[in-house]
């Protein structure tokens, strides 16, 4: 199938992917722009996995204070080069992720950051809530509830507040695919007036 330049341009504007990647995705999806976006998102996740081991020593720390002055967030986002760290897209994503932390109160950056004892404690609570169910059903329910816990407690697993069709990790993977660099949120701290650390 021959893909028009207008369609390639539209997909590029939507995703920020390269011309050739957009053309290939549109050919693979037979001109369906929604499928092409999904293809590019999957490619972004694959690219992110390849780049995950690379050192991220550059980056920025952003501060967000909610308009009422009662909630504040400091967030560090890293990349490989200062060139990427200075781009508007990188800075905007970091700032929006600080807003995400302010609004959604994650406790961890990634699911790998959740201590094993916290996971075991959550599992105990879930098992106690459903102890009357058959054993083979209990494990499936516990896994489902644990997945929900990760979606609430881990920044990367949360639904993005500005686009509920994506998770935070999808946005980071898209930026990794676009820049060709490893990008990650290293840490954040959320403050709320009246809350103890």
Curated annotation (Swiss-Prot):
Among PANTHER family, the record links this protein to: ELONGATION FACTOR TS (PTHR11741), ELONGATION FACTOR TS, MITOCHONDRIAL (PTHR11741:SF0)
Q: Which GO terms describe its molecular function?
A: translation elongation factor activity
The entry's cellular-component GO terms read:
cytoplasm
- Tell me the protein's name: Elongation factor Ts
Query: Principal localization?
Result: cytoplasm
This protein's UniProt keywords: Cytoplasm, Elongation factor, Protein biosynthesis
**PROSITE patterns this protein is in?**
EF_TS_1, EF_TS_2
User: Which Pfam family, any one, appears in the UniProt record?
Assistant: EF_TS
Primary role: Associates with the EF-Tu.GDP complex and induces the exchange of GDP to GTP. It remains bound to the aminoacyl-tRNA.EF-Tu.GTP complex up to the GTP hydrolysis stage on the ribosome.
Subcellular localization(s) per the UniProt record: Cytoplasm
Annotated spans, Involved in Mg(2+) ion dislocation from EF-Tu: 81-84
Disulfides per UniProt: none
In terms of domain of life, where is this protein from? Bacteria
Provide the family line. Answer: Belongs to the EF-Ts family.
**Do you know which InterPro entries this protein is assigned to?**
EF-Ts_dimer_sf, Transl_elong_EFTs/EF1B, Transl_elong_EFTs/EF1B_dimer, Transl_elong_Ts_CS, UBA-like_sf
Species whose genome carries this gene: Thermotoga neapolitana (strain ATCC 49049 / DSM 4359 / NBRC 107923 / NS-E)
